[in-house]
Every structure is written in structure tokens, then in C-alpha cells.
From Swiss-Prot:
Domain Expansin-like EG45 as annotated: residue spans: 62-167
Tissue expression summary: Expressed in pollen (at protein level).
Family that this chain belongs to: Belongs to the expansin family. Expansin B subfamily.
Top-level taxon of the source organism: Eukaryota
One Pfam family this sequence matches: Expansin_C
Protein name: Expansin-B1
Post-translational modification: Glycosylated.
Amino acid sequence: MGSLAKIVAVAAVLAALVAGGSCGPPKVPPGPNITTNYNGKWLPAKATWYGQPNGAGPDDNGGACGIKNVNLPPYNGFTACGNPPIFKDGKGCGSCYEIRCNKPECSGQPVTVFITDMNYEPIAPYHFDLSGKAFGAMAKPGLNDKLRHYGIFDLEFRRVRCKYQGGQKIVFHVEKGSNPNYLAMLVKFVADDGDIVLMELKEKSSDWKPMKLSWGAIWRMDTPKALVPPFSIRLTSESGKKVIAQDVIPVNWKPDTVYNSNVQF
């Protein structure tokens, strides 16, 4: 076979592979969105892990929810990237799940993880890409590293209510770049459902106005007219519960600043 014929033959083979979708494992469509149906039923999923073996996942201890320092309390590195029906375009940020595995190295005891990041690997209807610490925590004592050597395996999961120790209240972080005409806030440490489906803002002497979900757990308000502080925030959880953080953002608010509320679900 001449060189030109060889090139044509190779090109034909490559085209057939691409057309037939033969590159890589088959894609699995995502399952239905996980809701606040706390019925205790365990569901099947795939588990992987990333980052440092005993780390919180991302090297910057952050993630697609916008939450930072997930290696520190109250998350303590027990975090996970959820695939689309778990992450839900950011509306799953902060939700909590129990996970357990049944390998010989597994303890069989459930481990609770917080959703702080996303993954779009189409390997299963439900997929948890766990921090190394959370993955290893499913093991029997002393077998953490051996369990992590699997890299990927089947597990069971169920959604649970989020619980924070020590009377932790909801916290708001006014994001960098915020100004009187653009206000962006990260909300974190939400108990019970853990996630928020609606965030509303009330200026001084005004009515409630809905904010827009910007990305992850960050909500924003854009307005041509300067916002007048102090700002109250009303949160609605996935199950419809509401709390109001009255005047939580003060008159002299600043961007890139944390404001603690005195409310919790």
C-alpha cells in the first residue's frame, strides 16, 4: 500500500471511531434531581475522589459553590462535588448527604458530606466526586489509604438534613466588586435543607425584592438606582421554610466582608 493510501486508510478508521463514539467509556444520563424527600431510602451512586489524600478536594479549598476554606470547621474537609441532579446548577450547594460503601475495607457506617462543588463526568446517574478525606472516612480504622486505592466504586447515598454544631448561624459574605448598584452575596452554613431556592433583599423603608442566583451559592441584585442600606435578607429553603435576617448588612457595609446573622432554619 502506498503512503497516500495508508494516510487515507488511517483517516477513515479515525473518522469511524469518532462517528461511532468509540473514544472513552459510554456516557450515562443523569438521574432525576434529588429533592427534600427525607424518606431514608438509600440510592446507588458512583464514588470517586480528587485532591490530596487527606485534603478537602480543591487545592484552594474552594469550589463551584463559591464557598472558601472548606478544609476548616464546620465543613472540616467532608465535602463533595455533585453531578447535575445533586448540584442542580448551584441550588444544591450546601445540601447534605450520607454515604456508605460495601467494599471489604469499608466500615459500613454512614459518613455525612456537604455539597460544595460540581462535576459533570457522565459515569452514572448519581456521582459523588469526594474529597480525599471524605472518601477515606468510609474505611475501617487504618484502611483509609487502601480504600482510596480503588479510585472509583459503587456506594449508597441518601439526602439528610444539615446539622451544625455550637449554634452556628447563617453567614453572608458580600463579594468583591459589590457596590451600591451591584450587590452580590454568598450564603453559607444553612441548616436543615442546607440549600436556598429564593433569596430576597429589603432596603431601608422598601418592599422585598428577589435576587438572582448568579452562580454556585452566590446571589446578586443589579439596579440602576443605588441601593439604600441597611439590608435585610429573606431566605426560602427548598422545602419552603423562610427566615429573615433583619438589617444583617449594615449602613457602612463593605465588599469582601463577612456578616454574621442571628437566624437559622
